[in-house]
Amino acid sequence: MEADFVIIGSGSAGSAMAYRLSEDGRYSVIVIEYGVPDVGPLIQMPAALSFPMNMETYDWGFSSEPEPHIGGRSLVTPRGKVLGGSSSINGMVYVRGHACDFDHWSQSGARGWAYADVLPYFKRMENSQGGQEGWRGTNGPLYVQRGKRDNPLFHAFVEAGHQAGFEVADDYNGEKQEGFGPMEQTIHNGRRWSAANAYLKPALKRPNVKLVKGFARKIVLEGKRAVGVEIEAGRTFSTIRARREVIIAASSINSPKLLMLSGIGPAAHLKEHGIDLVADRPGVGQNLQDHLEVYIQQECTQPITLYSELNLFSKARIGVEWLLFKTGDGATNHFESAAFVRSKAGVEYPDIQYHFLPVAIRYDGKAAAQSHGFQAHVGPMRSKSRGSVTLRSANPREKPVIKFNYMSHEDDWADFRHCVRLTREIFGQAAFDPYRGAEIQPGAHVQTDDEIDNFIREHVESAFHPCGTCKMGAVDDPMAVVDPECRVIGVEGLRVADSSIFPRITNGNLNGPSIMVGEKASDHILGRTPLARSNQEPWINPRWQVSDR
């Protein structure tokens, strides 16, 4: 079996590439996916988001090694093992990232990936329902909507931010990210709008696109040229050959693992596992980054939260309404207000993100409070801690060693203390006076630096945004894995295009920029002239040097 292009992974970037590479009919595309079909309400119903990311059926089941700086805790790292990849199990929050994120990429060696370069690709991929005119796309495959924000707590959160002196941002994916405002969702007609729904399924209707179910074991190379992929399907091993190129889009965990199993990575590490060296790239598996967050939870004195919907009868009613009409509380992820703010004067653009939720509950669906409550998920966006993904053995079936080194940099602790105290300030504003009860978490007794640090150590959670393990950069950067056209340095006919190529993590959730990578990489792969650069200038707070708001 062979095709012009062989893509490993049907996730955010992989699905976008399958769609674009096959678009004009000139080239054939095979997409290799080990995961299951994305069918059923647990995947497609937005409110059911806590289920698929905790189910072996849909998730690769990765966890970090015990993390020494957070008390030896091992944090789960869900990655989608399903059509659509992690876009089929994520929280459906849509964030492009800040303009300065991409300018930093370009300045660090990823030339051609500045904000002016990537903004046209964000516009090409979007079908924005209500975003800022002129800054948003309206004809792309990816539907992006805003929630209804029926609950008064959503408006209280935005008003509280304004009362605290922060900006209001009506469209954080438009000209101005900084401020409090509505959150955007990849939901369409009441359904999760994953990369599979947006890109892969339309592509699979074309005669030149084929989906092959199989476990990718390694890249097949002839000398230093990639010519195919060895896959395992059942008990059968076979090779799918690529006439032009192999493109890895297997996630920030599996992409570096696959490179190393194929002889591309740190020479000493590969030798340790008896793998023949093809290209010594010490950056493969390094530069691992993530976002962490804590939940600040408050009791609500009025019975207006989602707590009323957590009983079995209400869940059944919500499920039936969604199954019949794709409406109601099942048709939203309930993240409908957000904020991006700066932590201190001298910080040029936001480095803290908020998700607001009108219930006190964990991501795994367990209620933290036995009564009405609300919460903010808050965390710093630019941690200085860095980790790694390395091989546990040369067995492709064995999960890799994942070490994030969470909270290993002292600045991360100071940033999180500020996040906790800032959230208390926001919840203390007059807008919350009609609703505010006692603080559930951390609790009013947690006040000193040491007490807050202990709370963070025990309760900090991953936001599930791993990236950076196949860093994009200049060809003379010894830690770069791919060049600015996503080509693996030192190997021909092989590219990586997913969140693993991010030089540095972006502001916010990663599904949006991952899809953008797939869109832009497609033009590089096809040898097209990139879309014309934008001349639109993003808003930067004129007070950034003297004030945090």
Swiss-Prot record:
NCBIfam families: betA, PRK02106.1. Belongs to the GMC oxidoreductase family. This is Oxygen-dependent choline dehydrogenase. The keyword Endoplasmic reticulum does not apply. Pfam families: GMC_oxred_C, GMC_oxred_N. It comes from the Bacteria. One of its GO terms (biological process) is glycine betaine biosynthetic process from choline. It catalyses: choline + A = betaine aldehyde + AH2; betaine aldehyde + NAD(+) + H2O = glycine betaine + NADH + 2 H(+). Its EC number is 1.1.99.1, 1.2.1.8.
